[in-house]
């Protein structure tokens, strides 16, 4: 899991994709489910500066400090998985995609154990779930490319939906369509808003997005 990709400048797409999508790849926390994770609290407990990416920062810590911080992270993630709830409109949106023959996957910076526990609790089932235990983490595009290769499609045939810039940056680097899920928040205040091809405020109001994705 390398943080080097994150430091590279990502430019927004100037030319929108065309044609219907064959698959949609979702972020998990904050997009499909609300697990109440507070990364600012985690950073304070770990003694890390505000705003730094947790996983990449922990890679560069001394072994004893990294072990301590990982234990804090896992404790918060496990608590989040135990209280996770599906966000409004998500089930209906997934059902609509399924009815249209659109494949669905998840990519997350969570561990395999936590991702599986979260999705099981929320009764969400996906064909593929890629976690930090499987390979390079977003904003690296590896997981998106792996999913596309498994599906036998090119990234331009999929849309990536997430609530943070790492999701959007990974999608752009892979060559996928990108959708920032704003959850009703002012988009100008959200990291990645200037990069995303589309913005989505609510899964309950996704008709326009589906049309934009050729569905």
Model regions and ranges:
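Asp-based, Mg2+/Mn2+-dependent phosphohydrolase catalytic module
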Residues: 1-22, 92-99, 112, 116-215
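Conserved phosphate-coupling serine/threonine residues in phosphotransfer and NTP-handling enzymes
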Residues: 31, 108-110
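Polytopic alpha-helical membrane proteins, predominantly small-molecule transporters/carriers
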Residues: 105-108, 118
